[in-house]
Amino acid sequence: MGRGGLASAAPLLLYPRYEVFPTRTVEQAVVEWVPRDMTVTVTASPGKGLEATLDLTERLCAHGYRVVPHLSARLVLDDAHLAEIVARLGACGVDDVFVPGGDVDRPAGRFDSALSLLVSLDQMGHPFSRIGITGYPESHSRIVDDVTIQAMWDKRRYATYIVSNLCLNPAVVRRWIARVRARGVTLPIFIGMTGPLDRARLVNMAAKAGVTDSARFLATHTGWLVRLGIPHGYRPERFLDRVGAALAAPASAVEGLHLFTFNQVRQAEQWRRSLVQRLADPQDPPRAESAP
């Protein structure tokens, strides 16, 4: 592959969003490696609950970051609980949230979907200026395609942007962007991807998340875990080279990159800095490896 696709993606590498899990050590890693003008998103899980997400959000806000917490709908109890969350986030200056349904079989309260929580936020008077929703380039492991497609259509009026779920196949990502636009959904998109990942550390991190969260993580990410484990299965520069032109096309309306760090924050930022520097240096162009 040549440099064209990578060069097209270069502007998106300047200010990607970094997604992290709320763990004991991740705050230090973010503060040490992530520039203060970057956006950090904080996930929510059934095992840790929303409190861990909100706590890390508050601490990262205090460090000067723009933070986007995940408000998983099925972890919110009711409208009173939602109002408390909104007030707490408002107090630390959060104006952007990401609203997934939440990977939990039984809702904790009355919200059974992202749409139901989005409607309640709307009825509260739009307390956040930006709201993100999920897009699925590949089929969801537990939801049929027709449902996810309809859900995006239903949620689009309450959201301001889409974040694509992690997909390591550039051809699938390109086709998905085209399909979203063909359906008349015009929200800007952040494309989900990873930097280089240590597969062993990734599985170990999943194990530390607890039995339930770990089993769900490994079950829902089997495909790209396998891809990470084979030689030349996934290389982030090759991925960007193959999607770069599509991301840069005005019709795609891609706003940025969303880096799933899986808390390998240092590796992600070192990779990003190195690639940005090489793309800016015509004497040292990065090479995207070809497929085996």
What are the functions of these language-model segments?
Residues 2-147, 254:
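Active-site beta->alpha loop and helix N-cap motifs at the rims of alpha/beta catalytic domains
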Residues 61, 90, 155-156, 181:
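Non-catalytic positions within long, well-ordered alpha-helices that form the structural scaffold/packing
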